[in-house]
Amino acid sequence: MVSVFLSTLLLAAATVQAYLPAQQIDVQSSLLSDPSKVAGKTYDYIIAGGGLTGLTVAAKLTENPKIKVLVIEKGFYESNDGAIIEDPNAYGQIFGTTVDQNYLTVPLINNRTNNIKAGKGLGGSTLINGDSWTRPDKVQIDSWEKVFGMEGWNWDSMFEYMKKAEAARAPTAAQLAAGHYFNATCHGTNGTVQSGARDNGQPWSPIMKALMNTVSALGVPVQQDFLCGHPRGVSMIMNNVDENQVRVDAARAWLLPSYQRPNLEILTGQMVGKVLFKQTASGPQAVGVNFGTNKAVNFDVFAKHEVLLAAGSAISPLILEYSGIGLKSVLDQANVTQLLDLPVGINMQDQTTTTVSSRASAAGAGQGQAVFFANFTETFGDYAPQARELLNTKLDQWAEETVARGGFHNVTALKVQYENYRNWLLDEDVAFAELFMDTEGKINFDLWDLIPFTRGSVHILSSDPYLWQFANDPKFFLNEFDLLGQAAASKLARDLTSQGAMKEYFAGETLPGYNLVENATLSQWSDYVLQNFRPNWHAVSSCSMMSRELGGVVDATAKVYGTQGLRVIDGSIPPTQVSSHVMTIFYGMALKVADAILDDYAKSA
């Protein structure tokens, strides 16, 4: 009788555990925080950074029980820290907390500094971002192979990997009626990362449909699925949320199913400072990393096969530079002996954001978000001839100016990038600007120029990785076309807010409001943008994946040129910006790189 009772009790407990929300699982206590537990040990792979790509690759590698992986993360397991992370509607509330790296830029245009938001904790920036789920244009990914020489990096290949990551939920009838659209052929359903419509249970605002009707009258397509390879027009978008409307960050998606594997160890509260090498006849070979918290307290740990850098576009370049890989001028200034000459930390491309916001009438009440991916002509409107003239006459000048400012190192190679972007905008109908509209008592557009011509940099300033001294310099708006594009997109948002079907719900502008005259010129908008922009926090390309001749740091398998056993596997490697939010790309990229790593492992076994 006691045995039956105990069995029943255990079954009930197991059932309760199965239905407990993920946020109640005590993951951190199962992870490592004592560095002495791993110091001096040898693993097959060491991953520096437990963000989106780091956790994805760790999970894929450790599916093979023979492969032993160590992930070293500066932060901790934060996914169970309440609504500030779990609730996608709480976006922005986490900024400035211990989960936000909050890097400070060098003084930029108008002598302004800006904060760069990036996640600190297992899950990385998926803990703090807006969890938007879109994909780029086919021609953008195809250019990685056709223009930059990265064999296998084309839309068809990446599309399959991106779908492989995804577990999509189709919209409900009510969500479809509100303005969602879903093309099942463009989605995966058997992946790990859940995606679906954001829905707080409140009535839907009619403003999304009003925006669609307004732009449709102008010839713009509406209700598109922005995951099919040509994002243009207006639609509602998907988000990384589960069926309970809880954020599905990378820790929930990849760590929760894998953290108890005996061949996976996660060390938290420590940062990787530099890569350890031994010299071989074939060049420097990565054999481990030095990690810790300060110059006096740090440790070595060793890798039998590879070191994988996944610390993000702002930090992975710094780890390379601290390790002696980078431009000689940068390393000399920081008193680091150069091991290998590569253009690390340059070509960094981030976008800029401004906001146009208005009050909504009572008739516009309700929840909802919609996105307008506008092409070149739609963004610039009457100013399109002026913008086209710049693209057709200024590329040489821009390339020379960018190299002179330290944003890139080779004028000829940079012009290849610029010509690629010009082709996208003028010949391929690629989305140039994103206007992200949020409702609930307002008509709020956050908007950004998706395709920047500015090139920034991030470099170390000392030889001590634990002093955290570096210069993050996005060089925003040092290219005239970027400023013109941001101004035009801002003007477009204001124009749309109070015209066509949107008029019914417009109840007065709050931003820019009285700070900018009603019929402002593009020049006046440019002045406003310079005083009121913020970074978009989508930086890529600081360790570019392209041919070495064009300025690449890593090859098509993410291996650092001139080394053995070292890859960069994060958002610093895409060679271009894209007309999309970046999570889908990073997940697909991580799965593709994981396969390349496993292929090499199989050959070495």
Curated annotation (Swiss-Prot):
GO CC annotation terms, alphabetical: cytoplasmic vesicle; extracellular region
Subcellular location, record wording: Secreted; Secreted, Cell wall; Cytoplasmic vesicle
Positions bound to O2: 559-560
Glycosylation (residues): 111, 183, 190, 335, 375, 410, 519
Enzyme active site: 538 (proton acceptor)
Superkingdom in the source lineage: Eukaryota
Keyword set, alphabetical order: Cell wall, Cytoplasmic vesicle, Disulfide bond, FAD, Flavoprotein, Glycoprotein, Oxidoreductase, Secreted, Signal
Description of what induces expression: Expression is induced in the presence of glucose but not xylose.
GO biological process: secondary metabolite biosynthetic process
Record bears the keyword Flavoprotein: yes
Catalyzed reaction equations: beta-D-glucose + O2 = D-glucono-1,5-lactone + H2O2
Applications (biotechnology): Glucose oxidase of Talaromyces flavus is a major factor in biocontrol of verticillium dahliae, a soilborne plant pathogen which microsclerotia are 100 times more sensitive to hydrogen peroxide than propagules of many other microbess.
Leader sequence residues: 1-18
Residue pairs linked by disulfide bridges in the UniProt entry: 186-228
GO molecular function, one term: beta-D-glucose oxidase activity
List of residues binding FAD: 52-53, 73, 125, 129-130, 132, 272, 571, 583
InterPro entries linked to this entry: FAD/NAD-bd_sf, Glucose_Oxidase_domain_2, GMC_OxRdtase, GMC_OxRdtase_N, GMC_OxRtase_C
Quaternary structure annotation from Swiss-Prot or TrEMBL: Homodimer.
Similarity-based family: Belongs to the GMC oxidoreductase family.
Protein name as catalogued: Glucose oxidase
Species lineage: Eukaryota, Fungi, Dikarya, Ascomycota, Pezizomycotina
